Amino acid sequence: MNVEEMKKIAAKEALKFIEDDMVIGLGTGSTTAYFIKLLGEKLKRGEISDIVGVPTSYQAKLLAIEHDIPIASLDQVDAIDVAVDGADEVDPNLNLIKGRGAALTMEKIIEYRAGTFIVLVDERKLVDYLCQKMPVPIEVIPQAWKAIIEELSIFNAKAELRMGVNKDGPVITDNGNFIIDAKFPRIDDPLDMEIELNTIPGVIENGIFADIADIVIVGTREGVKKLER
Protein backbone atom coordinates (compact mmCIF):
# COMPACT_ATOMS: atom_id res chain seq x y z
CA MET A 1 0.00 0.00 0.00
CA ASN A 2 1.48 3.36 -1.02
CA VAL A 3 1.20 6.67 0.82
CA GLU A 4 -1.79 7.95 -1.16
CA GLU A 5 -3.69 4.73 -0.45
CA MET A 6 -2.90 5.10 3.27
CA LYS A 7 -4.33 8.63 3.20
CA LYS A 8 -7.46 7.42 1.44
CA ILE A 9 -8.23 4.64 3.91
CA ALA A 10 -7.78 7.05 6.83
CA ALA A 11 -10.17 9.51 5.18
CA LYS A 12 -12.71 6.76 4.54
CA GLU A 13 -12.58 5.66 8.19
CA ALA A 14 -13.34 9.21 9.33
CA LEU A 15 -16.66 9.13 7.47
CA LYS A 16 -17.93 6.70 10.13
CA PHE A 17 -18.01 9.59 12.62
CA ILE A 18 -20.21 11.81 10.44
CA GLU A 19 -23.98 11.84 11.02
CA ASP A 20 -26.98 13.75 9.69
CA ASP A 21 -27.39 17.38 10.78
CA MET A 22 -23.75 17.79 11.80
CA VAL A 23 -21.66 20.93 11.46
CA ILE A 24 -18.23 19.75 10.32
CA GLY A 25 -14.92 21.62 10.45
CA LEU A 26 -13.14 20.93 7.15
CA GLY A 27 -9.36 20.90 7.42
CA THR A 28 -6.65 21.72 4.91
CA GLY A 29 -4.17 19.49 3.08
CA SER A 30 -3.90 16.42 0.90
CA THR A 31 -5.32 13.86 3.34
CA THR A 32 -8.28 16.04 4.28
CA ALA A 33 -8.91 16.65 0.57
CA TYR A 34 -9.69 12.93 0.24
CA PHE A 35 -12.11 13.22 3.16
CA ILE A 36 -13.93 16.19 1.62
CA LYS A 37 -14.25 14.35 -1.70
CA LEU A 38 -15.61 11.20 -0.01
CA LEU A 39 -17.98 13.27 2.12
CA GLY A 40 -19.36 14.96 -0.99
CA GLU A 41 -19.89 11.59 -2.67
CA LYS A 42 -21.71 10.24 0.39
CA LEU A 43 -23.92 13.32 0.43
CA LYS A 44 -24.68 12.96 -3.28
CA ARG A 45 -25.70 9.31 -2.80
CA GLY A 46 -28.17 10.36 -0.13
CA GLU A 47 -26.40 8.40 2.61
CA ILE A 48 -26.17 11.52 4.76
CA SER A 49 -28.16 14.75 4.86
CA ASP A 50 -28.37 18.27 6.29
CA ILE A 51 -24.66 18.66 6.99
CA VAL A 52 -22.76 21.94 6.87
CA GLY A 53 -19.02 22.32 6.40
CA VAL A 54 -16.97 25.09 8.00
CA PRO A 55 -13.75 25.41 5.95
CA THR A 56 -10.42 26.24 7.58
CA SER A 57 -8.96 27.69 4.37
CA TYR A 58 -9.72 28.77 0.83
CA GLN A 59 -8.46 25.37 -0.32
CA ALA A 60 -11.02 23.58 1.86
CA LYS A 61 -13.74 26.02 0.81
CA LEU A 62 -13.13 25.48 -2.91
CA LEU A 63 -13.05 21.69 -2.46
CA ALA A 64 -16.32 21.75 -0.53
CA ILE A 65 -17.97 23.83 -3.26
CA GLU A 66 -16.58 21.50 -5.94
CA HIS A 67 -18.15 18.51 -4.18
CA ASP A 68 -21.47 20.25 -3.45
CA ILE A 69 -21.06 20.37 0.33
CA PRO A 70 -23.02 23.25 1.91
CA ILE A 71 -20.65 25.61 3.72
CA ALA A 72 -20.79 28.34 6.34
CA SER A 73 -18.26 30.55 8.08
CA LEU A 74 -17.47 30.12 11.76
CA ASP A 75 -19.56 33.13 12.76
CA GLN A 76 -22.62 31.64 11.05
CA VAL A 77 -22.82 28.49 13.19
CA ASP A 78 -23.59 27.98 16.87
CA ALA A 79 -21.25 25.02 17.35
CA ILE A 80 -18.99 22.60 15.48
CA ASP A 81 -19.85 18.97 16.10
CA VAL A 82 -16.72 17.43 14.62
CA ALA A 83 -13.61 18.73 12.87
CA VAL A 84 -11.47 16.61 10.54
CA ASP A 85 -7.94 17.60 9.56
CA GLY A 86 -4.47 16.26 8.87
CA ALA A 87 -1.17 16.79 10.71
CA ASP A 88 2.53 17.00 9.94
CA GLU A 89 3.59 15.13 13.09
CA VAL A 90 1.80 13.22 15.86
CA ASP A 91 3.61 12.32 19.09
CA PRO A 92 2.69 9.40 21.42
CA ASN A 93 0.41 11.70 23.48
CA LEU A 94 -1.43 12.84 20.33
CA ASN A 95 0.12 16.30 20.37
CA LEU A 96 0.47 17.66 16.85
CA ILE A 97 2.48 19.86 14.56
CA LYS A 98 0.31 21.35 11.83
CA GLY A 99 0.60 24.16 9.32
CA ARG A 100 2.43 23.03 6.19
CA GLY A 101 -0.63 24.31 4.34
CA ALA A 102 -0.23 27.73 5.99
CA ALA A 103 -3.79 27.61 7.39
CA LEU A 104 -2.87 26.92 11.01
CA THR A 105 -4.59 29.91 12.62
CA MET A 106 -8.08 29.20 11.35
CA GLU A 107 -7.49 25.46 11.81
CA LYS A 108 -6.74 26.00 15.49
CA ILE A 109 -9.69 28.35 15.99
CA ILE A 110 -12.14 25.87 14.47
CA GLU A 111 -10.65 22.66 15.84
CA TYR A 112 -10.37 24.02 19.38
CA ARG A 113 -14.12 24.61 19.31
CA ALA A 114 -15.09 21.23 17.85
CA GLY A 115 -16.94 18.72 19.98
CA THR A 116 -14.65 16.04 18.54
CA PHE A 117 -11.41 16.69 16.67
CA ILE A 118 -10.35 13.85 14.37
CA VAL A 119 -6.86 13.83 12.84
CA LEU A 120 -6.05 11.90 9.66
CA VAL A 121 -2.46 10.86 8.92
CA ASP A 122 -0.44 8.18 7.22
CA GLU A 123 2.04 6.19 9.28
CA ARG A 124 5.00 8.41 8.32
CA LYS A 125 3.60 11.20 10.50
CA LEU A 126 3.98 9.30 13.79
CA VAL A 127 7.04 10.48 15.74
CA ASP A 128 8.65 9.94 19.14
CA TYR A 129 8.59 13.68 19.93
CA LEU A 130 7.48 16.84 18.16
CA CYS A 131 9.97 18.47 15.80
CA GLN A 132 11.66 15.12 15.21
CA LYS A 133 11.20 15.58 11.46
CA MET A 134 9.22 18.73 10.75
CA PRO A 135 9.58 22.39 11.80
CA VAL A 136 6.89 24.31 13.64
CA PRO A 137 5.11 26.77 11.33
CA ILE A 138 4.51 30.16 12.96
CA GLU A 139 2.17 32.75 11.45
CA VAL A 140 3.56 36.26 11.97
CA ILE A 141 2.82 39.88 11.15
CA PRO A 142 4.84 40.59 7.96
CA GLN A 143 6.80 43.54 9.38
CA ALA A 144 7.88 41.49 12.40
CA TRP A 145 9.31 38.38 10.71
CA LYS A 146 12.99 39.30 11.06
CA ALA A 147 12.71 40.31 14.72
CA ILE A 148 10.81 37.11 15.50
CA ILE A 149 13.47 34.93 13.86
CA GLU A 150 16.05 36.64 16.09
CA GLU A 151 13.84 35.99 19.13
CA LEU A 152 13.55 32.30 18.24
CA SER A 153 17.32 31.88 18.55
CA ILE A 154 16.75 31.88 22.33
CA PHE A 155 15.15 28.46 21.86
CA ASN A 156 18.07 27.22 19.71
CA ALA A 157 15.68 27.08 16.78
CA LYS A 158 16.77 27.12 13.16
CA ALA A 159 14.15 29.45 11.74
CA GLU A 160 13.53 30.77 8.26
CA LEU A 161 10.88 32.66 6.36
CA ARG A 162 8.86 30.31 4.15
CA MET A 163 9.17 31.26 0.49
CA GLY A 164 6.60 30.65 -2.22
CA VAL A 165 7.04 27.79 -4.69
CA ASN A 166 5.11 29.08 -7.70
CA LYS A 167 5.42 32.76 -6.82
CA ASP A 168 8.18 35.21 -6.01
CA GLY A 169 8.61 36.19 -2.39
CA PRO A 170 7.24 34.77 0.85
CA VAL A 171 4.20 32.56 1.30
CA ILE A 172 1.17 34.69 2.19
CA THR A 173 -1.47 33.15 4.45
CA ASP A 174 -5.23 33.51 3.97
CA ASN A 175 -4.99 36.21 6.66
CA GLY A 176 -2.34 38.18 4.76
CA ASN A 177 0.55 37.21 7.03
CA PHE A 178 3.93 35.46 6.66
CA ILE A 179 4.97 31.99 7.84
CA ILE A 180 8.21 31.25 9.69
CA ASP A 181 9.29 27.60 9.89
CA ALA A 182 11.18 26.95 13.14
CA LYS A 183 13.07 23.69 13.70
CA PHE A 184 13.68 23.13 17.40
CA PRO A 185 16.12 20.47 18.71
CA ARG A 186 13.09 18.67 20.20
CA ILE A 187 9.90 19.62 22.01
CA ASP A 188 9.45 17.78 25.30
CA ASP A 189 6.61 19.94 26.66
CA PRO A 190 4.38 20.82 23.69
CA LEU A 191 1.76 22.73 25.69
CA ASP A 192 4.36 24.95 27.37
CA MET A 193 6.09 25.64 24.05
CA GLU A 194 2.79 26.39 22.31
CA ILE A 195 1.91 28.97 24.95
CA GLU A 196 5.40 30.49 25.09
CA LEU A 197 5.70 30.99 21.33
CA ASN A 198 2.43 32.88 21.28
CA THR A 199 3.79 35.40 23.82
CA ILE A 200 6.33 36.71 21.29
CA PRO A 201 5.08 40.07 19.98
CA GLY A 202 4.13 39.78 16.32
CA VAL A 203 3.27 36.08 16.48
CA ILE A 204 -0.33 35.43 15.44
CA GLU A 205 -0.40 31.67 16.08
CA ASN A 206 1.90 28.65 15.94
CA GLY A 207 1.52 25.13 14.61
CA ILE A 208 1.79 23.22 17.90
CA PHE A 209 -1.62 21.71 18.70
CA ALA A 210 -1.22 20.34 22.24
CA ASP A 211 -3.96 18.43 24.10
CA ILE A 212 -6.56 19.07 21.40
CA ALA A 213 -6.82 15.92 19.24
CA ASP A 214 -9.44 13.42 20.40
CA ILE A 215 -8.92 10.70 17.79
CA VAL A 216 -6.04 10.08 15.37
CA ILE A 217 -6.80 7.79 12.43
CA VAL A 218 -3.61 6.37 10.94
CA GLY A 219 -3.42 4.81 7.51
CA THR A 220 -0.75 2.07 7.57
CA ARG A 221 0.49 -0.60 5.19
CA GLU A 222 -1.52 -3.13 7.19
CA GLY A 223 -4.71 -1.05 7.29
CA VAL A 224 -6.29 1.56 9.56
CA LYS A 225 -5.18 2.13 13.15
CA LYS A 226 -7.15 4.35 15.54
CA LEU A 227 -5.50 6.17 18.45
CA GLU A 228 -7.54 7.89 21.16
CA ARG A 229 -6.59 10.19 24.00
From Swiss-Prot:
Protein's organism: Pyrococcus horikoshii (strain ATCC 700860 / DSM 12428 / JCM 9974 / NBRC 100139 / OT-3)
Activity regulation: Inhibited by D-4-phosphoerythronic acid.
GO biological process, one term: D-ribose metabolic process
GO molecular function: ribose-5-phosphate isomerase activity
Reactions it catalyzes: aldehydo-D-ribose 5-phosphate = D-ribulose 5-phosphate
Temperature dependence: Optimum temperature is over 95 degrees Celsius.
Consequence of substituting D85N: Strong decrease in the catalytic efficiency and increase in the binding affinity
Record: active site: E107 (proton acceptor)
EC number: 5.3.1.6
Pathway(s) it belongs to: Carbohydrate degradation; pentose phosphate pathway; D-ribose 5-phosphate from D-ribulose 5-phosphate (non-oxidative stage): step 1/1
Result when mutating K125A: 2-fold decrease in the catalytic efficiency and strong decrease in the binding affinity
Residues under site feature: Plays a direct or indirect catalytic role: D85
The protein's name in its UniProt record: Ribose-5-phosphate isomerase A
Domain of life: Archaea
InterPro entries for the chain: NagB/RpiA_transferase-like, Ribose5P_isomerase_typA_subgr, Ribose5P_isomerase_type_A
Noted pH dependence of activity: Optimum pH is 6 (at 50 degrees Celsius).
Keywords, sorted A to Z: Isomerase
